[in-house]
Amino acid sequence: MKIRRALAADLATIVRLTEAAYAPYTALLGAPPIPVTEDYAPRIGRGEVRLLESSGEPAGLIVLERHPNHTMIFSVAVGPAFQGNGFGIALLKWADERTRRWGLPEVRLYTNAKMERNIALYKAYGFHETGRRPNPYRSGWTVRRHG
């Protein structure tokens, strides 16, 4: 397993992995999840996107934003064929490590309240709920993990 910075040439792979990973949630939410509709080219240019490769094949990705007092995970996506192998946890650990290297105290993320499988993963990893965003169409949880 290798986690590397995404390049402009990886854009189609990032879109494909994101669409595949979030596909089960489109029907549940009644619309594509926000990461599916994102334009990743600017994020790649800013160095926010990392690809996880398994045996040279793209298996997952994480999008991590650096803020003055925390890091924000915009998206964690693992391709369906690679789920259940610990790659999501590996990406969360990478985010923790990067947060420590930047000298920031915590990692934050938003997740849709209907994404129960993701919420269970985040809680098992040590995130805890800090609030909820009121949105009649996309209610969500705010969670964080202290480094």
Each model region followed by its residue ranges:
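Acetyl-CoA-dependent GNAT
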Residues: 5-83, 89-94, 98, 102, ...
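Extreme N-terminal starter segment of soluble prokaryotic enzymes
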Residues: 1-3
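C-terminal "cap" of GNAT-fold acetyltransferases
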Residues: 38-41, 48-50, 105-147
